[in-house]
């Protein structure tokens, strides 16, 4: 009886062990299948990351190249002489520096000319009445009438002056033919006659 029980226990152990082996084998098999799938997934993920990293590197290279091109364009850009605010800050070419120096020199010259002109105009305007401020209409009318009279007198005096000069020239040319003597004496007499006749003509007017 005891032997039969021992044999049954051994058989049960053996069968149990065999069941565990089968299950363990199945489990191991399943693990192997899962590991293959995981490896495939990992490989695909590595390829994906590699592709993404390569794309990122390409984008970075493109960005670096565009930035370098932009900086080179700015450095080689010519500076305009019209407006310094529109010029690039990083302009370092020799032509640009020469243009900047030239524009600065021209600006200094123009400022100097403007200051000299203002000073000259200021000196010319000393003692000059630029505007007449009238108290009322009667005062303004009187001032305009006086100004008109002064202009008429000045115009008449200029006309008389030109007439006197013209007549003096004609008389001196006529008297030159009638004067005798040497060249120097004749020139002296012409000067005296022309001066005297010119003054007489002005007084007679």
Swiss-Prot record:
Keyword terms, alphabetized: Nucleus, Ribosome biogenesis, rRNA processing
Listed Acidic residues bias regions: 33-63
Biological process, per Gene Ontology: maturation of 5.8S rRNA; maturation of LSU-rRNA
Coiled coil segments of this chain: none
Record keyword rRNA processing present: yes
Disulphide-bonded residues: none
Listed GO CC annotations: nucleolus; preribosome, large subunit precursor
Chief site of localization: nucleus
Localization of this protein: Nucleus, Nucleolus
Biased composition (Basic and acidic residues): 22-32, 103-112
Protein's UniProt keywords contain rRNA processing: yes
Record region (Disordered): 1-63, 79-118
Function: Constituent of pre-60S ribosomal particles. Required for large subunit rRNA maturation.
UniProt similarity note: Belongs to the RRP15 family.
Protein known as: Ribosomal RNA-processing protein 15
């Amino acid at each position: 009886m005891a032997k039969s029980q021992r044999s049954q226990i051994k058989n049960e152990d053996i069968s149990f062990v065999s069941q565990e082996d089968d299950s363990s084998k199945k489990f191991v098999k399943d693990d192997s299948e899962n590991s293959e799938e995981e490896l495939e997934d990992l490989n695909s993920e590595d390829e994906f990351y590699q592709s993404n990293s390569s794309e990122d590197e390409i984008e970075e290279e493109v960005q670096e190249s565009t930035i370098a091109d932009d900086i080179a364009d700015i450095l080689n850009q010519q500076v305009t002489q019209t407006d310094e605010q529109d010029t690039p800050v990083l302009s370092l070419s020799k032509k640009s520096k020469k243009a900047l120096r030239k524009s600065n020199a021209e600006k200094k010259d123009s400022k100097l000319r403007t200051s000299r002109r203002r000073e000259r105009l200021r000196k010319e305007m000393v003692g000059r009445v630029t505007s007449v401020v009238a108290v009322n209409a009667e005062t303004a009318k009187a001032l305009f009438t006086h100004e008109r009279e002064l202009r008429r007198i000045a115009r008449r005096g200029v006309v008389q002056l030109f007439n006197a000069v013209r007549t003096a020239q004609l008389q001196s040319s006529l008297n030159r033919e009638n004067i005798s003597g040497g060249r120097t004496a004749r020139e002296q007499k012409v000067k005296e006659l022309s001066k005297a006749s010119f003054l007489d003509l002005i007084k007679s007017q």
